[in-house]
Amino acid sequence: MKRLVALMLALVMSLALVACGSKPAETPSDNSDATENTDGIKIGIITLNMEAQYWLDVVAGLRSVIESNGGTVVHYSSENDVQKAVQQIEDMIVKEFDYIAVTCVDKQGLHPALVQAHDAGIPVITYDKTTDDTDLVLTQIQTNDYDIGFYMGNLMAEYLKEEGKVMSVTTPSVSVSDRNRGFQEAIDQYPNMELIMGEAANALAETTLPVVESILQVNPDVIGWLGISETQSMGAISAIEAAGMLGQVTIIDMSASPTSLSFVKEGKQEVTIDQQAYQIGVLIGESALKNSNGEDVESYIAVPWYAITKDNVEEYEAMVAERSK
């Protein structure tokens, strides 16, 4: 097991340009009350919400670059609503922002707003959830959803010695679908394994919990959970714990949340994956600064992930603490 984790860590870390980890997030700014610096660029960033640590870490990484260069960051939340995201982009266009960063909650629904920003001469950077309208954006920054799902599925197979039922929950999100496709295609390689896929409207804890409860009621012999986000895993772990199965179900998720890190240290969870949200924010900021200085920016920037296990969790936490100083 250590061999596979070490191999994957070596692979993804060889791609990294800077140290990994997530920095504890700052309190998000109110949309209308950001303190503006007039010397640098002004960039607005739209996240899916202002609660999940992942999104807060992206914003913190962006702030670390832009504000240290005399610029301003304004944080918007679409609340997973594409129409709200469109309105927020239109608001930034009217207010003549220099750059816009957005995670694409709906590729087709966001298209008109991307056209408006392009026509207004405002460069758009997509991150995490990207767009097919590559001609309308400056760059796209993300971890590859399918690849990380495929890695997690294979890792689960090794933990379970290639036998047993594994569960996950999908949502209409394209990125979630890609991750779950990776899960499925990895698990399909093992004839003695089965992936049970539930469905939910979104990846929030409150919508995931009843879905996982239902899966466990029908399939009490499930021995693995593959989670695609912090909030989703919060709901799943609550259901697993309520069923008295915490410690019996192998848990691998994309979270790196304080709860997941604690569970890893306590041996209640095997692996949690850090998508390097803070680094995604840093790359957004660096891309905007490069463009503002007339430098070339890659059209697609792949961000490596970091697998956290009981063997390296303390090292990971020390790295995060160092970055927060």
PLM features per residue range, with description:
Residues 2-23:
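Sec-dependent N-terminal signal peptides of Gram-positive bacterial secreted proteins and lipoproteins
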Residues 20-325:
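A residue-level marker of the well-folded mature domains of exported/periplasmic proteins
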